[in-house]
Amino acid sequence: MDAIVADPNGVPTVEEIRKLERTRLCLAEGMRMYPAPPILIRRALEDVTLPAGGMGREITLKKGTDCFIAVWNLHRSPDLWDEPDKFDPMRFKRPFNNSSIEGWGGLQPELFTGLYPNENATGEFLFVLESVRAIILRRLVLFVTDFAYVPFGGGQRRCAGDMFAMMEATVALSVLLKRFDFELGCDPAQVEMITGATIHTKAGMPVKLKSRRSSKK
């Protein structure tokens, strides 16, 4: 990051964000392992038959049926991810498929032309990046995970601000890492996750910060 971001305060330009591949994929992997929503809820607007998937049989949902999707379980399924409990940001650069999951397209990084992973690569998404320097309007085509990765939902009802949120997080992380070194302030085993309206830590996560500009903590 030091070699890429020129601003002494760590605020990257759009072109610098494009070069911060590992930083962007670290954020994406964090969203895979610790997604904000515990579940997604969808309602069938008409009778629909879902493919067999890994269950070995098709499932028909009647019109009006509510469908609950467990995002945490989906993102950590060994059927959909290689070593799902391992933090591995570069997994998004490797293809992965499972022929036993009928109807699943797998992870296809060769379709990656955007900045962040998402559920599919079939559409263009418009976002506005607002920074102290510019307002940038761009169209990004994302790469396909075929709905194995849905931290912001998917389809027509997915979060409208997902790209802005990820760009904002990249800028924030850049600023923090430019200024501080971080160290976990407790035993990792003490950090417990619980579910409410979001998935979050039970009692926070103590972190020690050391200024990179001085010896003060």
Task: For the regions a language model picked out, list residue spans one by one.
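Hydrophobic, repeat-rich solenoid/adaptor surfaces of innate immune receptors and signaling proteins
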Residues: 65, 71, 169, 173, ...
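Cytochrome P450 I-helix active-site segment
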Residues: 1-37, 44-46, 55-65, 82-94, ...
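C-terminal helix/juxtamembrane-tail motif
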Residues: 200-217
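Short FAD-binding loop at a beta-strand-to-alpha-helix junction that anchors the flavin cofactor
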Residues: 126-128, 149-152
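Conserved cytochrome P450 K-helix/beta-meander segment immediately N-terminal to the heme-binding cysteine loop
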Residues: 34, 69-118, 134-141
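Cytochrome P450 heme-binding "Cys pocket" and the immediately downstream C-terminal segment
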Residues: 136-138, 144-145, 154-156, 162-200
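Active-site proximal loops enriched in glycine and acidic residues that flank catalytic Cys/His/Asp
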Residues: 42-43, 71-73, 91, 153-154, ...
